[in-house]
Each structure stands twice: as structure tokens, then as C-alpha cells.
């Protein structure tokens, strides 16, 4: 199936969803797509998500979201990668408590929220679509508990991670800079002492090795690092992750090729 958008189903109970809850739910989905895109592509045109269709089916509110058409050197099909990664990641979390590809801790936390029933919204399902809806993935209790476990650090050790420094955020009054480092399809959040801010700014967008205290989840994945050592590394690519080069940077890549790549990726991890 050639993907053109994301279908979000909000399952209502006896109570209808309040407008504020409806918009909050959709905004969490939008932000999850943004988080994934920032891991997939360091720089480039970001998708603006618009409502393609809105309808009511029995007790479900069904919203279809598409990336707005814009003039850009980035192919429209490439902007659909976050949709595929979000649906695929939710399916991974139905099976096991691991951080899916292109997900960050914040993406995981958004899925926890989406999988938590609220008044008027008893559940949320996600699917890719192009005319016909693909396989729906229910954000159920299993997804919620696996997501919590995936983000929870269960082991601590000293070590290092290498990747491209992709995000810097100064936290007022806490004496630390929050960072994200990505390598291929993976991203790790971290904290760096605030007195290293200028050094971090010079390193932004470049490959670095960070040493410090690593926090791993039960699956052994590094989910956080408290940094005490920074080292610049030679740049081996510009802007896009290695997977991104396969999925969008090659001239002539098609929607079908992108979908097929993601299907193969799902099979290899399932």
C-alpha cells in the first residue's frame, strides 16, 4: 500500500469526547510524528499535518491526517516516513517492551498518554492509509505497559554512545543542558553540565562521542546518558540518518519503494 496519511480512531464510551480532549489527543499524535521526523531527518522541510477527513463511525471518531502539499526539495513520500514509523512502533510495543526505531523517550511518553483511557476517549487506534485503511494498531493496555517499561531505566553503568548531536535544550535553574544524540534509527536523550553549553553549540549537527553514566531499559537499550565527557568525531554523513539515505535521499525513490522497505524492516524485527 502506498501511504498518503495517518488514520486516527478515537473510541468513545458512554460519554462523548470533550472538544478539549479530542484536540489534545490529536496534538499528541502530531507531536509524536514530529519527534520521529526529527530523529529521521536532522534538517529539512517538516510536514505540516492537516485534516484530510473527519467522520463518525458508530462509537468512533475517525480522523485522517495528511502532510500539506508544499514546494520543497524533500519528496512528499519522504514526509510519510513518520506515519509508517509511528504505526510500526506501536505494533512493536504490542509485542515487546523495547524502544522502536526512530522513537525517543518523549515519543514513548506520548504513546503512554494515548494508550491511557480518559473520559470520552476510551481508546485510540492508528493506521496508515491511502484510500483504504491499513492494519489498525490498537494502543491498548499492553502497549501502555510495554512503553512504560521501554522508557524505564533498570540498569546503570559507565560507558559511551556515538552519534549526531541533534537537539539542545537549556533547562532553567537545573544547571544542565538536555540533549538528544541519534545514530541511524536510534536516539538517546541525555544531560550535560551547563558550563559545556558553548562546546555543545559548536558540536550541534556533528558526530560526537559522549561518555558518562548510561541508563538502560530491561531490553538492554540505552535510554539516557548523564554526560561527563564530549569528543568530536569525523562526520560521515550530512543531515540524514543512514536509513534516511535509503528511504529518501536517492533520486527517483518512490512511495512504493519506501513502503516496501518499511515492510521488510517490520518483518526483520518481528
Annotate each language-model stretch with its function:
Residues 159-161, 186-190, 223:
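Short beta-strand segments
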Residues 215-241:
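OB-fold/S1-family single-stranded nucleic acid-binding modules
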Residues 194-211:
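Short nucleic-acid-contacting surface segments enriched for D/E, G, S/T with interspersed K/R
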Residues 2-158:
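Charged, alpha-helical interface segments at or near domain boundaries
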Residues 156-171:
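Structural detector for short beta-strands of small beta-barrel domains
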Residues 234-270:
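Extended, charge-rich, solvent-exposed interface segments
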Amino acid at each position: 500500500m502506498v501511504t498518503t496519511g495517518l488514520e486516527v480512531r478515537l473510541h468513545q464510551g458512554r460519554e462523548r469526547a470533550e472538544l478539549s480532549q479530542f484536540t489534545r489527543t490529536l496534538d499528541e499524535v502530531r507531536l509524536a510524528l514530529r519527534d520521529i521526523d526529527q530523529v529521521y531527518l536532522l534538517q529539512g522541510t517538516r510536514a505540516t499535518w492537516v485534516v484530510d477527513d473527519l467522520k463518525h463511525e458508530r462509537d468512533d471518531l475517525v480522523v485522517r491526517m495528511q502532510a500539506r502539499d508544499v514546494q520543497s526539495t524533500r519528496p512528499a513520500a519522504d514526509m510519510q516516513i513518520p506515519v509508517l514509523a509511528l504505526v510500526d512502533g506501536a505494533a512493536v510495543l504490542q509485542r515487546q517492551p523495547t524502544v522502536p526505531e526512530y522513537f525517543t523517550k518523549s515519543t514513548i511518553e506520548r504513546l503512554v498518554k494515548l494508550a491511557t483511557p480518559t473520559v470520552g476517549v476510551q481508546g485510540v487506534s492508528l493506521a496508515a492509509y491511502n484510500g483504504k485503511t491499513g492494519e489498525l494498531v490498537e494502543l491498548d493496555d499492553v502497549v501502555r505497559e510495554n512503553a512504560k517499561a521501554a522508557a524505564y531505566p533498570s540498569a546503570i553503568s559507565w560507558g559511551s554512545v556515538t552519534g549526531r548531536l541533534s537537539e539542545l535544550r537549556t533547562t532553567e535553574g537545573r544547571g544542565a543542558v538536555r540533549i538528544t544524540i541519534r545514530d541511524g534509527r536510534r536516539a538517546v536523550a541525555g544531560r550535560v553540565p551547563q558550563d559545556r553549553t558553548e562546546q555543545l553549540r559548536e558540536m550541534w549537527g556533528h558526530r560526537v562521542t559522549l561518555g558518562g553514566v548510561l541508563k538502560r531499559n530491561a531490553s538492554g537499550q540505552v535510554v539516557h546518558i548523564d554526560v561527563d565527557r564530549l569528543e568530536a568525531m569525523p562526520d560521515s554523513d550530512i543531515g540524514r540518518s543512514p536509513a534516511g539515505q535509503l528511504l529518501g535521499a536517492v533520486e527517483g525513490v518512490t512511495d512504493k519503494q519506501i513502503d516496501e522497505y518499511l515492510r521488510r524492516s517490520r518483518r526483520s524485527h518481528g
